[in-house]
Amino acid sequence: IMGRMAAAAKEGGASGIRAQSVSQINEIMKTVDLPVIGIIKRDYPDSDIYITPTRKEIEELLTTPCQIIALDATNRKRPNDEKCEDLVKLIHEAGRLAMADCSTYEECVAAQDMGFDIVSTTLCGYTPYSEMHEGPNFELLKKCVDTLHVPVIAEGKINTPQDLKQVYEYCGVFSAVVGSAITRPQLITKCFADVL
């Protein structure tokens, strides 16, 4: 089904796909010729990090042709006490781009300094110490765009076309990832049902 979802996204104007799991990435990349940001979500008992948390997930992603590998780059403890810098190095040694999923400005700066090729605000509001917003954190995005030299991708809580327009026009982001607003039919249906 994810291959069909990706084909529909491409038909609608998407210029890339963010996908979770080796099987979904492979299916999508057989179906569409768009760049793919690959992740694997996996829980570990010794850490709150679950987006591409360890070397194991990166090695799994490297079996796919995805061009970009995204991982949690927050200040939290990684499983097995692994170091983010080592994971970035592993990604680069394989000739792929590394994308940092961050929750604060300081994490975005640290990710850039660590050698990440791209930073994103994916985890803003999802760590205990980051600000929760109903929509995208426009001020955080603008500050990152204005001060960092790596591309900034807006991700997280882009719920409307107006949100997307604002992250480009006001914040000046390089690109944006729209997730649940497109990929979860139950949430789309709920938005309509809730007005009745």
Tell where the protein language model's regions lie, with residue ranges.
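Catalytic cores of alpha/beta
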Residues: 48-49, 53-63, 103-117, 149-154, ...
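Charged helix-capping and loop-helix junction motifs
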Residues: 1-3, 50-56, 82-86, 133-141
